[in-house]
Amino acid sequence: MQQILTNIVLDKTLSTEGYVVVPFLEESHVNTLRDFFFENHAKDIPGFYATAHSTDIAFRKKMNDKIKAVFENSITNYFHNCLALGGSYVVKSKSQEERLHPHQDWNIVDESKHRSFNIWVPLVDLNENNGAIRVVPRSHLWVDNYRGPNIPDYLGAFNENIWQHMQTLNMKAGEALIYDHRLFHASYPNKTDELRVATVFGIIPQEAQMYYYFGDGDAVNVYESSVDFFMEGNIQKGPEVLKKVNTISAPTLTKRALPDYINFQEVKETPIEEIKQVEEKTNRLGWLKKIFR
């Protein structure tokens, strides 16, 4: 297994548990990022908002450049031989009343060879009232699957079961949740009058090729991708100018270590149309399942 973190103990925990929480930004850096956000945004933010979803590419880059500059030293200190991809502000306001359901982030590398990660850093202290993150330790080892636009979420029907078994991370401003993109995670709604402002940043091993996985009926098309595509393209619309390198016909969901509260046989036998209906009803925020969550 590739070493991701410079600290061997933390690296082992990341590998076995799927995540670690570490001190990451000094208070002055937290204030810098928070002030920069409010300097460039109105106070009223509707629902869930991410700068990476802006249609203004120059604005996306401006937000990314600031986050990257502030994160740079901490990334150098914590990560071993990794490539820093890009960052986004992710903000929850009181008007987003529903929770973000349990989910995994998209595949962006060949997970049979490499792993990919997010660095998620709140700029305010978190609790259950203002949008704290929840995780399922070791859930990154549950299944081998493909995740991306137009690819059904086969475990979506078990959202409530998964939620009941999650652990809440009441993080402090400036701490970082470093997690494997395969890890099941979710978050509470923000019930307070203050915005829950956070930042997220993608990381992959230096030698890993980026890929974009796009569902096509019963198949999954695989395209060579890049940081520029995720930063500048409209990744919801499809591969656009990317080079297709493979088509995986009728990809299977492979069980590795599912817990007892998820019936694997039921998952495999659920009709695809039923899976899509569950996604529409319970995960209207499914478009968030990307590198910049």
Residue ranges and their predicted role:
Residues H103-Q104, D153-I162, L195, F214-V220:
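Short, surface-exposed loop/helix-turn segments at secondary-structure junctions
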Residues L85-G87, E98-L100, R115-V121, G131, ...:
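Generic beta-strand structural signal
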Residues E111-E128, F201-P205:
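Short, conserved beta-strand element in jelly-roll/cupin
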Residues M1-E111:
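Non-heme Fe(II)-dependent double-stranded beta-helix
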Residues I4, L183, Y188-R293:
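Non-heme Fe(II)/2-oxoglutarate
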Residues E26-H29, V90-K92, N107, L126-E128, ...:
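Short, solvent-exposed loop/turn segments at secondary-structure junctions
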Residues Y19, H114-N118, N130, W163-T168, ...:
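Extracellular structured ligand-interaction cores
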Residues E128-Y188:
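Double-stranded beta-helix
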